[in-house]
């Protein structure tokens, strides 16, 4: 957030935060974990930050009441919010649902079955909402996503996120361990793999497309502009591209490249981009034509 922002950011993954995101931008991403009693819980981290043994801090080893007592909302709490679901059903909004695999302390080693159970529960929960097609995406970093889809038989659009990162530990360690996976997979290779698996979208880190890291992959690099962008268009064809993070200074460039942004920057007090242009937060659900863009950018 800008240092002078007066906006109070809601708790990540809370119903309040997701309602705000649904109203302010084109949709939201949320994280789900599975409790011991089979409830889908809106929580990101592999362990709760408490001074307790790991097996007492792991969400997958707790029941939903124990997790809720820590201030965590259930997925059902979100679906009970008409403010959220009405926008999902009628305002061209999308919801990306990231399914989390458990910390090793849980001793849940069959990630494909664990994810398949979550997928089935998600699809069953959404059955009566009558959502528009392609308004929901399920995904995760686990390489078992495709196997889980096969096991569950769900029909929701799905994909695997890249690079594959270990599901536990500190962020820096995760990135370090994930480096070989990042280096060995080019954008072209990722697109071919996802297409082969019947996945409509490639979800990837920005480093694949921007910065010096894009040069360390095998083959010719792609980028957000110039010849690299033309190369990206050629290899992606009609595949959707979901990319994170989305820095403010790159928002317009990424949108012009046809990329779906996954951004944490949903502060309603941010009205302009670093280049001085107006920031329009709903380019997909309420797109502006060129006349409106010019009018907004020329306004005082």
What are the residue ranges of the model-derived segments?
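Phosphate-group recognition and catalysis centered on beta-loop-alpha active-site segments
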Residues: 1-300
């Amino acid at each position: 957030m800008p240092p002078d922002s007066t906006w109070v950011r809601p708790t990540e993954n809370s119903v309040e935060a997701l309602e705000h995101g649904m109203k302010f931008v084109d949709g939201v991403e949320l994280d789900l974990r599975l409790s011991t009693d089979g409830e889908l819980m809106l929580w990101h981290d592999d362990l709760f930050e408490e001074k307790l043994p790991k097996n007492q801090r792991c969400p997958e080893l707790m029941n939903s009441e124990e997790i809720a007592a820590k201030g965590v909302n259930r997925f059902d709490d979100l679906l009970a919010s008409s403010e959220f679901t009405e926008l999902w059903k009628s305002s061209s909004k999308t919801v990306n649902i990231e399914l989390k695999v458990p910390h090793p302390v849980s001793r849940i080693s069959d990630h494909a079955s664990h994810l398949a159970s979550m997928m089935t529960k998600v699809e069953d929960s959404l059955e009566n909402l009558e959502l528009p097609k392609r308004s929901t995406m399920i995904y995760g970093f686990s390489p078992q996503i495709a196997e889980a889809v096969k096991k569950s038989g769900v029909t929701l659009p799905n994909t695997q996120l890249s690079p594959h990162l270990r599901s536990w530990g500190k962020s820096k360690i995760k990135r370090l361990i994930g480096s070989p996976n990042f280096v060995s997979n080019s954008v072209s290779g990722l697109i071919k793999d996802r297409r082969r698996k019947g996945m409509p979208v490639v979800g990837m880190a920005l480093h694949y497309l921007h910065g010096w890291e894009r040069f360390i992959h095998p083959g010719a690099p792609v980028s957000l502009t110039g010849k690299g962008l033309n190369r990206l268009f050629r290899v992606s064809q009609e595949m959707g591209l979901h990319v994170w993070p989305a820095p403010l200074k790159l928002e317009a460039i990424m949108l012009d490249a046809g990329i779906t942004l996954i951004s944490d920057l949903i502060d309603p007090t941010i009205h302009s981009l670093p280049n001085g242009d107006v920031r329009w937060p709903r380019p997909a659900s309420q797109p502006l034509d060129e006349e409106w863009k010019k009018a907004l950018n020329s306004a005082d």
